[in-house]
Amino acid sequence: LLLSHCARDALVDSKERFNPPKCAPHTREAIQKEIIDWINLRILSGLVMWLTGSAGAGKSAIAQTIAERFNDEKTPSASFFFSRISASPTRVDGDRLIPTIIYQLCLLLPEYRETVMKKLMKDPNVFQRSRDAQMAALFTKPLQQFSLRRFFREIRNPRPIPLLIIVDGLDECSDPQVQCDLLRIIADAAASIRRRPIRFLIASRPEAHITRTFDQHPTFHQNRLRRINLDNDPEASMAILTFLRQEFRKIHESHPLRFHLDPFWPSQEILDLLVLKSSPQFVLASTAMLYIASPKHQPMERLAAVLNVLNTPTSSSIDRPLSKVGYPLYVHLWQR
């Protein structure tokens, strides 16, 4: 019953999300440290963190990197990655969020799972009820029953590290009203279980209705919200430069046509231009490098085409060579 209402394609390691965006090595380290310190209770303010920024700023890459880190370290977490460009319709369905989080918590917490299973047997119609009712019956009330000692025993963690719940791409849920409703429900749940070590990391664009909900809900006013705006990240340009250097190094080391490359290509001037044109939208740099690194083409010619695109911002996206890389994503970004 529970699994049938989940969005399995929205999980951090789902097959549908093969090769998801993530932070390149040695990039966004300060942002990641701030998030990890907040999760680990070294930063005491906020039960909820809002990671925001414009399209392509790197929100999903950071969320994916944090989620994978928790998985690798066997630290309990649950996640949901919305996506409007996914082939899976479940990844834009806001009604799938709560069951999917509950499902993951059931895998982590044996006693919690028993409580949830009993509730589902008693009321198999629970997923036909409101999202508020689902969250109260299957999330808030069961977790309120746990003492702190019992909670940490359940998550099998010797250190008091909170349970992390990640919701990425909330703005890509298909219905803006549902987006706001889910935010309100998360805020109410966070307030109800504030004595439990649980953190909610929400990543989204700063859409007006989402910003308004964060600004107006009383829970977020009472020192329970922490914000990170990637558009204001002073390290964005350095992170993009580090990424570009790493990717061009790979081309020099392994591209089929690497022996035709100038050993000093590209120049620092070109790297600086790419950083200037990309920052703070990391996705432009990553899309450009996918295009340039194509094994069937000459990288220097591809870079020249990219530079031509970046210097003709008024040209239609259909004429831009970058559109051949991840075409649906590219068109989605540049035709907004």
What would you call each of these model-derived segments?
Residues L1-R336:
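Conserved NB-ARC/NACHT P-loop NTPase core of NLR-like innate immune receptors
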